Each structure stands twice: as C-alpha cells, then as structure tokens.
From Swiss-Prot:
Transmembrane segments: none
Protein name per the record: Leucine--tRNA ligase
Signal sequence annotation: none
Sequence motif: 'KMSKS' region, positions: 575-579
Ligase recorded as keyword: yes
NCBIfam families cross-referenced by the UniProt entry: leuS_bact (TIGR00396)
Pfam families: Anticodon_1, tRNA-synt_1, tRNA-synt_1_2, tRNA-synt_1g
Gene Ontology annotations of biological process type: leucyl-tRNA aminoacylation
Organism: Latilactobacillus sakei subsp. sakei (strain 23K)
Record GO terms (molecular function): aminoacyl-tRNA deacylase activity; ATP binding; leucine-tRNA ligase activity
InterPro entries: aa-tRNA-synth_I_CS (IPR001412), aa-tRNA-synth_Ia (IPR002300), Leu-tRNA-ligase (IPR002302), Leu_tRNA-synth_edit (IPR025709), M/V/L/I-tRNA-synth_anticd-bd (IPR013155), Methionyl/Leucyl_tRNA_Synth (IPR015413), Rossmann-like_a/b/a_fold (IPR014729), tRNAsynth_Ia_anticodon-bd (IPR009080)
Family: Belongs to the class-I aminoacyl-tRNA synthetase family.
Lineage, opening ranks: Bacteria, Bacillati, Bacillota, Bacilli, Lactobacillales
Keyword field: Aminoacyl-tRNA synthetase, ATP-binding, Cytoplasm, Ligase, Nucleotide-binding, Protein biosynthesis
Amino acid sequence: MTYDHRAVEQKWQAYWQSHKSFKTTEDKDKKNFYALDMFPYPSGQGLHVGHPEGYTATDILARMKRMQGFNVLHPMGWDAFGLPAEQYALDTGNNPADFTQKNINTFKRQINSLGFSYDWDREVNTTDPDFYKWTQWIFEKMYEKGLAYEAEVAVNWSPDLGTVVANEEVIDGKTERGGYPVYRKPMRQWMLKITAYADRLIDDLDLVDWPESVKDMQRNWIGRSKGAEVSFAVENHDANIDVFTTRADTMFGVSYIVMAPEHKLVADITTPEQKAAVDAYLKEIEHKSDLERTDLAKDKTGAFTGAYAINPVNGERLPIWISDYVLASYGTGAVMAVPAHDPRDWEFAKKFGLPLKPVVSGGNPEEAVHTEPGVMINSDFLDGLDKQAAIDKMIPWLVEHKVGHEQISYKLRDWLFSRQRYWGEPIPIIHWEDGTTSVVPEDQLPLELPLTSDIKPSGTGESPLANLTDWLNVTDENGRKGRRETNTMPQWAGSSWYYLRYIDPKNPDKLADFDKLKDWLPVDMYIGGAEHAVLHLLYVRFWHKFLYDIGVVPTKEPFQHLYNQGMILGDNHEKMSKSKGNVVNPDDVVDRFGADTLRLYEMFMGPLDASISWSEKGLAGARKFLDRVWRLYTEEDTDENDQLSSKIVADNNDQLKKVYNETVKKVTEDFESMHFNVAISQLMVFINDAYKADTFPREYAEGFVKLLAPIAPHMMEELWAMLGHDDSISYVDWPTFDPAALIANEVEVIFQVNGKLKAKVTVAKDTPKEELEAMAKANEKVAEFIADKTVRKVIAIPNKLVNIVAN
C-alpha cells in the first residue's frame, strides 16, 4: 500500500495535541535537557523553508533526549514587537496588535504542521503584558543600579518618518525604507551601560562551547585594546585635546590632529577666518550615518579649524582639523594623525597637503604608507628600539611629564535603548514637572501599552505615544504633574531574557523561580542564524550577567552550546526573498510531499551549518527514501492500512547484526554532534542492507523506527503502532548497541598474481597463512591464470592479501 502522508500526519498531530505528548516533565530522578530555538518575529509573510532547518535540528535533539530518559524543555514563542507591524498599522489604519495576533496564528499553524515537539503550555509572547511586565522590571532594576541613564545622543533623524533610524538602516544619507533624507540630530535617549560589562563579556566567552567565529566577532565588536591616553594642549586656549592611541611609540611622527565634527571643542577653537569653511563642512555631513562615515573606501573629507595643538614630546605645532571619519562616540572623539604609518591618515594628509614624518625605518612614505615593522627613527630617546620596547619606554615618559597615562579602550559603545515608536514595551519612567524622574512603582507594573489604531508620528521626534494625552499625563497624590516616558524599548529587549520565562511562564510574582532556573540553566543547546552573532547574543549575555549580579539567575552565562544553522538559498543560489520570487512556502511542500519529507530533506541537504540551495529534486529523493522505508515495513499487495510485511519476523539470523549495531552507534553519535546528514546516510545504508537480507528481525525493525523517529516522527509513529504498540514512540527507550557486534568476524582479502589483482574474497578473520594460500590457489580466477605457469613464491598476509609470483 502507498503511504498517505496527509492522513498519517493529521492523525498523529491530533494525537500529540490531545495527549499533550510534549508537556515538559520535571522528574527529579532524571537529568534535564533544554533545547532552544531563537524565537521568530511573526511577520506577515508567514514561515518560509529556512525557519524549519534550525527548528528540525533542535527537535531531533529534543526527541532523542526524551527517549534517552531526560526531562526535556523544548519551547516556542514570539518576538512580536517591531517595526513591520507598526508600519503596517500606519499604512492601513489597523491595530498592530490584531495584525500581530493574526500572524502568530499563521506561524503556529505552520509550525504544528511540521510536527515539532514544542510544549505549547510554555508559549511566550513579548507583546503580552504579563511577559513585558518583567522586561520593564529588569529595566527598573538597571535604572536603580545606574545602568540605565538618559543622554543627549546624536541620532539619525528622519523627519518624513517622524522617527530615529538605526545606523544599519541609513544608506547614502537616506532611509533604507522609502529613501527619505536623514539628518544627524542630538536627542534625549535612554542608554544601557553595557560598557560596564565589557571585560566580563570578553573573558566569559571561555566558559561556553560556541563556534570560535562567533566568539571572535564578539571580541572584535567589544574591541578591547591597550594603549595610552595623551593630552595635547591647544595653543592660545585653556583647553586640551585628549587622544587614545595604541601606538605611543609614534608620538614623534604626529603631524596633525583630527577631531570629530561633533567634538565639544570645535566651536571654541575655530578661528574667525575658518568659521565659514567649518560651518559649511558641518552642513555637508549632517546626512551621513556612522557606518557611512567610517567606510574605509570612501573619499576623505575635512576642514581646518585654524587652531593648533602642541605635541607634548617635542613642542611642535600641529594643525587641528575636523573630519567625519572620526566619531565623537568612539574613544575620545579625536585622533593624533601619523600619516607616514597609518593608511587613513596618509590618504587625508595626501589630499590636504599635510606633512609626513617617518618614525619607523624602511619604506618611503612619500610614495606609499609604510605599515611594516622596523626600528624607531627620528624619535629622539626612542631611536633604535622596536615597537614594543618604544611603547614601554614612551608611556612612563608621558606619565612622568603628566601629559598621558596607560589606558584600556573599547570599541563597544553603550546600548541606545530607546525608539521613537509606538509598537514596543513602554519604558516605565515618569518625568515630573520639578525636573525629577522616577520609575513606575513595581506594584503598578506592567505599564501597559495603550491600544490604539491611531498611530501616527508625533512630528516632534517623540513616539506616537506623545499623542495619547490621557495615557501620557499623570498626577501624583500630592498634585505634582508628570509626563510618562514616550520612548519605547527596542525589539532586542524581550529577546534578551525570554529563555528564562519559558522555565516558569505563569509565575505572577517573579520573573522565574530561582530553583527552577537552577534546574534548567544554562540552556544546553541554542540554535539560530549567524546574523545574530553580535547584537542579540551580546545583549542577552549582558542582561544575563546583570541578573546574575542581582541574584535572579544562578549562572554567569545563558547558553552553554550555540549552533548557527546555514542559510537555505533559492534554487538560483540567491538568498530567498519576495522580490526575487524564489521563496518556497513550507505549506506547499507539506501538502505535496509531507512534513517528514521536508524535515528529512532539510537535514540531508548538507552540513547543518552550510548555506545550500533548495532543490525540488532533493525533496523528491527524500520522499523516495521514506517510501522505501514504508514498503519495507508494509505488505505491498493489500489495501489494508495496517498490514505488516511478512518479512518482519521474530527470529534473528544475525544477518543484519553488524550493520544494525553500527547504525545505532553512528546515528546516536551523529545526532549528538549535529551531523544529521551523515546520520541519514547511515540510515540509508541500513535500509539497503535490510532489503537484501532474507528476513527483517522485529528487534531491528523496531530499533530502526526509533532511530528515524526524531527526523520523521509521523511515519515512525504509524509504523510503531503497526508493530503492535499502543503508546506513542515519543518516550520509548532509545536503542543501544552491542560493542562486540561491531567487531568484524569476516574480512575482505585480495588475491593477486604478480602484483595484479585477480579476485576479492571474504574470509573468516585471522585465517592462517597456509589456508589463505590454499584458498588463493583454488580460486578459479587465480587458478586460470597460473595453470600453465610455475609458482615461484607465495606471499600471504592474514586479513590483507595473498600474492602469487608465477611465470
């Protein structure tokens, strides 16, 4: 009989739902395993075939671990705040909450159609007030500890959108969405002091088993570097420009100073003669985002302020310039330029005719920048020293002369935590008329987002919440008037702690019970896309460390193992996108081929961490394999749906003993190490051998069903029932292997004549030389060749070969 995937999949999905098959067990006698997917943003497009790749991998692990006797926590939820829902609401006049709920319903239907073993009793949604009550609570704790603060920050302001956009959303001075002009504008923003955790965020990467590439990206993003901070006095002003440098050895090569255009000293030190040029330059760059400004490939621009600084090591006058390649937010907002030995400084100096002063031997800076190592030259008391020795001598000199000190600097900036948007968590802060600020009292949390479909930009730069005056204005018991914070939190907020709420999702009194957190943390396996390597994974580690410091969580790190699945590309090898028309909808695949086929195919495409193109042919191949499995187990020439093949017998003639035990060992190890494609290859080897065997022992038939169940759960549940079992396969014991069965009793030996291969034969292991020699001579292909020749010599090596020398 043919396999009807639609009927079987519907049957077992209904069974799992009605029996709550995947409800998390919390048996104290069992070990715990927490398998976590990065929860999705429920977009209007629904699921695409890229989502199930990571979800299938965690599901395989979760299903295997249940069968191995673990308590398994395998939850799913929704990262549901965010810009697309708000944009949709602006465009259509509909409520983003309704739109979001509709999308969640679609996602949930699609996810369930793929047979994932989630415990839906633990579902979380970042837009649910019962959830974001605790997001707000964490913010308040950070505020109390001085880690949440307000600052005037230069942001990318889009008057047309009526909001601030992130650096990543600005392209050539315009917004990515809609192409509206962007201006740099200082605005009051909430910041989180992630820099206070910079060292721990680097050092504690040693505690986790993550891909080295992700660890490196985080280390580089934090950008810890050791150097010196040097003070340059401004000529004719009572002011100093502080500069951080990792190359204190090149102090004698400084030929000018460059400040960020936003540096606080620019207005004070610019001379009347240069004011027009400086003002024109400031106007020119106001559309540029930080990303564009620091693009190494772009042409260097700048303006001379007319002022000079004094080099503290030799008293030389250094012209002070401004240029947009220096950012006010990085380091001190000013750099000392050593154009002979730094590519950006060299380009700038060449463009504006500034002097080049070589201080490292070798190279010709007039022709090209010289960055190779050498010894110090033109550097007074540093001459003849190598780089490190010169740094080690210069820093104490700077300290002694009170013009500098040793300093550790970080590329990491504090986290800009506010958005001028409606569809986000309200920040639980009240600004009072007397100039003070307070948090919303804890017993009044959550501070709920007022539901409205009238979401339009305020026009002032504030979020649309500024329009909702009933919500906005408050009065305390003493009659003091106040105004709620109108900024909302960024989409990163809820995702920075959601994995904790899954552990205790209904707790009204705590973010989560500490003993439960102790039972389940750290997360054993976290799977998601590599695009989150820095932002999400850095933010979540920062929040976790803060919660550890205040005694809310028991571990220093949230996730023990991290795995980044690759990307599924369109069949034209490009990223799937609606605009390219190459998006594959999983609903279509499930309808035509079945969920088990989709799961099997996505795990068999290649290594889980590789980016691979979608192939209809590969999908058909996966279905073909499942059909072969089905035919092996079922009686073909009957219409009855539960007729087991007569090939499946109680007796075991050991024909499949070795390959079965090899398969159990290999599949178990490959599942553990996420090598699912290799595991599937071994399952295919077993099925091929089972077809060739005379009978299929029930013991192995049942064992194989257990091995394939985590990948193809619907078909395997059906076969398990056909094998006579009343209960679901979800909690039956995982197969074990017999190590003795892996030892080969037979080996392949080759027979040669005069070094040329004549035959390959299978013989008993450790067959003695004399017997091997006799077998070789008796072999018809060998005998035919030596019939009319004299055998001069026979070389027999047990378990390997027999070579007969004859002429």
